Amino acid sequence: MKNDKTDFTQGRILPKLAFFMLPILGALVLQAAYGAVDLLVVGRFGSTSGLSAVSTGSQVLNLVTFVVTQLAMGVTVLIARYLGEKRPQYIGQVIGGAAIVFTLLAAALFVVLVFFARLISSLMQAPAEALDLTASYVRICGSGIFFIVAYNMLSALFRGLGDSRSQLIFVLVACIVNVIGDLVLVAGFHLDAAGAAIATVAAQAVSVICAIAMLLKKELPFKIHRSDFKLNPQCKKFLGIGLPLALQEFLTQLSFLALCAFVNRLGLEASSGYGVACKIVNFAMLIPSSLMQSMASFVSQNVGAGNKKRAEQSMFTGIGIGLVFGCAVFALVWCKGDVLSGLFTADAAVIANSYAYLMGFAPETIATAILFSMVGYFNGNDKTLWVMVQGLVQTLLVRLPMAYIMSIQPNASLTMIGLSAPTSTAVGILLNISFFLWLKRYENQTSA
């Protein structure tokens, strides 16, 4: 098939899954790092309004990025499936079709983010003193959306091939570019939020160039032809997998934007504190996120090869890995959340608001170890419609209503608002366990 390192259908599960997951985790750490650097540098060398602008603007960009990532999951799963089935001849068509689809998507996002940046910022309830800076941040990042979309498509391609190391390399280069850009433009030229946005776009551009260069040099188990670059039958297949995930992620991120708007109404200090907390949350969620991404490729290969029992075992292995690290992260966030917040700003009020939110959010670091591993399993098993349904239940029936109710209370508590996340995740775990047991029963009955 491929070399043994990218063949997940044989060998011990724990080391195979761990070694595949580690570079993905490293890449996610670096992505979170250069997002955090924006906030850290603006917090230290910019204004409080700039800090709020980066906080609110990055929420908008997170929505776009996460939705594109989930849509690209269809590419990852389909490539891994064809490798598991030993039908690599279809992969060129998958890549060519994906290039066309994601280019069209990037063009649409460019129009929305560049020409409607101020409207989006207003809908986000950006504080009046930070509105112009927020719109500028969104507009500049929107101008580089082609790089953001291309990066996520290329990352999905590498993961589908069982190669998680290449992604780590080109993200490392991007992180270095972003740090240098932030220091020069924000600390040096005092461009505040706009400088952070320019640095982010430049970093994404460099990462795409590196990814393309690495892909061209890589020895691939298939050929890509010019005729593959069109809307072909493979587009329907990967969109069938990715669209439910993208819709679910869109509504989930929309709920976090609504949450951001709820918090913004509580004032500039609450808005800035929430922004700092979100950067810490991004780091706290890295291990569950890397498990989910690696699980999809791992499971998809085994399902393609007919190894369903091994696919199930990989899910339980992932849950075990996640729980070990999740408990450690929980303890750190719960006990030292104020210290972590202090890394981003010296403003005592902002630190207090950030820590208040983290106290409510902290149990999420444990709960997602279970949820994300199960979601990764269902993604790889082509049960993305279910993933969408359970995600919508969490978002629309639990997280959003609870966060809104807590935000309109007299002397609204950021801790109680933060608690809406682990509460909705707990509901998601119960739903996924029920579906997993039902699915096993159904498969046993149909195979009997």
Regions found by a protein language model. Give the residues of each.
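Transmembrane helical elements of multi-pass membrane transporters/channels
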Residues: 19-38, 140, 174, 203-207, ...
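Helix-terminus/linker motif at the lipid-water interface of multi-pass membrane proteins
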Residues: 29, 33-52, 121-128, 184-191, ...
